[in-house]
Amino acid sequence: HRLRQPASFESGGEKGGLFKSIDGGITWKKITNGLAKGSSGMIDISIHLNNPDIMVMAYEADENLPEDEPGTGVYISYDSGESWKFLLKHAVRPFYHGQIEIDPINPNNIYVVSRGFMISNDGGKTFGPRRWRTDGGDDHDMWIAPYDNKIMYIATDQGSRLSIDGGSTWLSHNNMAIG
């Protein structure tokens, strides 16, 4: 079982996991194909706007898995979430880190929004660190315009950042705390 006390927090549990409904939530099926075994915690999924068969997921798995088994990190599905392929070991924290976004126009662009912000431009074959600097501390959230993938916002510790050129340059709005 997981520990929850004022000075400690462990997310997830044995009954957690990824569940799918295709009847408006009347029935649910637990999805396990390709996912880490054992308990799971925080999960974030992004579905491609023009092809809902393509999904990417940030998945928090049991921290005691053997090193050679897929665990916490990034997964991708090409069949509407019925099965998943492990792409990248990456820390997915249970609080505000671990959001994932798939570019609404180009599904090869995957953004893992966290303290260690990672980007793939080849459908998850490789990942690298973000190519821009936002001077905002930890990244918490991201939005990409569905009609123009060059327009994006990032929410950080200090406020928000707007780019209209795909992340080459950023306009900072440091007047709000986000996270």
Predicted regions and their residues:
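Beta-propeller blade termini and top-face loops
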Residues: 1-179
